[in-house]
Amino acid sequence: MNLKHENIHEYVIKCTNTTQITLDDDFNVMDSKPDIDLIVKEWGMAVVNGVKVNQDKAQIDGTLVFAIMYTGSSENDKRFIPVRMDGSLNFLENVNLSCDATGLDVNCKAQLEDLTIKSINSRKISVKAIVALTVTCEEIKNISISTGIEDGDCNAELLLKDFEYVQADVNMKDNLRIKETVSVPNGKADIGSLVWDDVDVRNVNTRMTEDGLSVSGELNVFIMYIADDEAGQVQWYETSTPFTGIIDVSGANPDGISYVGYNVISKNVEVRPDYDGNNRDVAVELVLDMDIKSYEECSRNAMWDMYIPGFDVDIKQETQQLKKLIIRNNNKCRVSGNVKVEDYINLMQIVNATANVQIDSYECIPEGIEIMGAVIVNIFYITSDDNSPMGSINSVIPFTTVVELKEYNKNLIEYTIRPSIEQLQASMNSSAQIEVKAVIALDTICFEPFNINVIDECECNKRENVDYSALPSMVGYISDGKCTVWDIAKKYDTTGNLMREENSTIQRLVDSDIIPAGTKLLLVRKAMV
């Protein structure tokens, strides 16, 4: 007997592995730059350049890009000035996989977990970093669901059940290039040379449209520069500017549930002349690596059972796993803490604050998913001390929050939570203490897998050596309260419709309903009708 089948497409993670690598190297200061007096700030970013797969091994080619700002002596008046130094460190790492990744979609995410840059002497620095490499191997799995039979003249009785599930209709990676320009306001001097920049992506919103994935957000831009005037004073400016972008997505569904992750893989900040020819414009160009997924909630009828009165039907069933969406939201968590300033620091003004979120653990509790982590904050300041005019403080502010879930099985759920800094503020409570306030966004999606038994194949044969004339055409039956309409109809070679026609007490029951205990029924065998 030929069955009708419909396919459901699922993206399945075959295997994943996370490994940590340690990078360590020394770098010399260029001859054109002054000696290092004190390292004030540091910045780093780990980028994956390519992934090569050989069966159960993945070779990761990547680069650690870093920069430091230090204070050095000016050649003219011997005063301390901020100086920037950039560098990069390439790495090649083999990651073992628990599956054969040949032919699979293999992706790698690099996360800089720790960066330590120290001066060995006034002309050399030591760079040490810990980078976490997470390799994920995915494949498309086609799940076949039987929905009926092809034989139109077959008098088969079908038990169809509705079920709801979610399937991924988009699973792709692409780059989003952001180009924005900010201008130094009136009252600030023209830019002579750019010393330092910090660019943070915040408040990112994504949604599927008919044109593709629409992305919007804010760029928080901070610059420090040497003024283009006789005094050559150090100046800084911080602002936010909105950005938008569109990524082409084949088969984009505006009603789809999008879940998008992003990671900065390239940053370029340049000073450009404005319309008057003065260096007052700053061009910011970022490249975001976008991990784009979109899900569709579906409802479908599946054939769970079948029989033909008067025939023996051999059914082969198969268990398939699907998943349903439990929650998709963006939780907010407020974090605050006080940072102690050492007594020897004559703090005069906070210049800039940057932060990132580090998650330490997830735990399923009755209320939902408990998240424990910390906000790693760096506060850049200036002092009233001419011998040490600027510096920065690193601090860790722990937090605990809960993503609420209702009626879930903690042993089954699959979830992804992407944390990011949405708001950050640092203010001086006193010369000895800085108050830090942050708002963390926890972009969350959670699924619960479930199994369904579907008919894969069936074979029917007419019963032989059965004398139907010797069998009663009608049977009296008293329900025990354990069987459904379908169970009884299948056992006694009748149909649910025929049972409802002959018995008014069950006219409102469907085939999958249990017949109440004590209900008296008259069953007419269809094979004898």
Predicted regions and their residues:
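Primarily a LysM-type cell-wall glycan-binding module
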Residues: 462-501, 505-529
